[in-house]
Amino acid sequence: MDRPDCDPLLLSRTYARFPVVNRLLSGWRRTYKRRIRPLLAETGHASLLDIGSGSGDVARSLARWARQDGFTLDVTAVDPDQRAYAFATHLPGDKRVTYRLAHSSELVAEGLAFDVVISNHILHHLDARQFAAVLHDSELLCTRLALHNDLQRSNVAYILFLAGFWPLGWGSYIVRDGLLSIRRSYTMAELRSAIPPAWTVESNGPWHNMLVHQHQGSGNRNRA
């Protein structure tokens, strides 16, 4: 689905089915409760940047969970792919979610800052230069916490994903792209050897690794 010439109908169905996959596998509800909600509880409000937001389902879920808990989470969801941006912006809107067609580096250039910076399932799509750039941008953009959630490569994950999600594969890229993503993804040891000292790697459930950066210091950037 990264290919510019992929079938638009299959791609649209893939975006539409991402919420099912993320709800079952990605662990963002757990991460929200453990990582993001405690920050919200301090002031009642926070800003969050979702890098490579795709269909926008994670961004919308986080804003909704915060609202249900009585907090305000203003989410900026950025993706450089026009197709993802078009899909997300044609869905029913959420006043707390803003979509932008942009790279993270553009937000750095604008001097923006967010309490929390996240991504979901993008690291395995990046080459070494892009990987380093996203982590660097995240350090510059976050004022409190950065969390990058990605698949953990394993034979068990590959087999179980194929067995459990094949119904979603019909008419979409879900299974094909999911299996390729697992093959491209990192083990925990590989991530530890690839990240700079300001980052740590944690297990996020049985199928994911999470890169974590706790911001130190302060600056005079433009709060988003």
Locate predicted features.
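Class I SAM-dependent methyltransferase Rossmann-like catalytic core
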Residues: 8-33
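A short, conserved alpha-helix within the catalytic core of class I
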Residues: 126-137
